[in-house]
């Protein structure tokens, strides 16, 4: 099939196709062996942005299942085709996936998101239901990408950081390691100084625009569980089972960082200041922020001098 070819079908043929899912804005049908057709309903057509949609049609990316070809039904544009992902939602599978396999998949996903930033594609409406686990390739896939936005007004690094923040937020929720989540693995890990400190650095790095990876948290969590129980967990389900057998006590002196809600995950100076205050229980002044920036610059300069030596 030629790239960006318009596929024309009639409603009678469409009604004979297998329905894979229904949403507020569309119905998804199986189309051949390797594709699906997403048919927009009235609500979906109102939200459809033709200019943005045309830009997405020209982009290829391994993690994002982007629109491939326009579809006309009874002579009118009604949707598009995209790759068929043979698998389940990641949140339904993540507990049983081998940790090394999961880590490898996340690293590949991070590289794909890096590549996507070159085209200035921003994630919009990313949610847990749109993150899939491809059984055939052991890879993470993101579907429901038709509302993603191409915006050339931002730098590539800004695009990458914004998308990684969204992606990492979803992964933390599905892994069950987010600060403030229900009792169990998350609560157990955040009472451990090794993990708690690593999580603090991870959050601060994200707020300061540094590249932060959930992979580091998974590896530290596995190490913590091994040290505590003498068992190397193979997956998250084993971690949860081990932790669930213990009575968890929260220390009064444990300084657990407050997680920034998804709707506030914008790297603005105001929100960054707010989170730092929550994590330190100390109100930050402008002078404090300037001092932090100066210390960061000094460390970078020292590192450069050491490398030259």
Regions found by a protein language model. Give the residues of each.
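ATP-binding glycine-rich loop module of kinase domains
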Residues: 16-59, 65
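Juxta-kinase regulatory segment immediately upstream of eukaryotic protein kinase catalytic domains
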Residues: 1-15
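Non-Sec secretion/translocation targeting segments of pathogen effectors
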Residues: 1-3, 271-273, 281-309
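Conserved structural core of kinase catalytic domains
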Residues: 65-105
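C-lobe/activation-segment region of protein kinase-like
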Residues: 134, 139-230, 235, 260
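Short C-lobe core helix of eukaryotic-like protein kinase catalytic domains
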Residues: 108-118
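Catalytic-loop of the protein kinase fold
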Residues: 117-133
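Regulatory extensions appended to serine/threonine kinase catalytic cores
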Residues: 234-263, 267-275, 279, 288
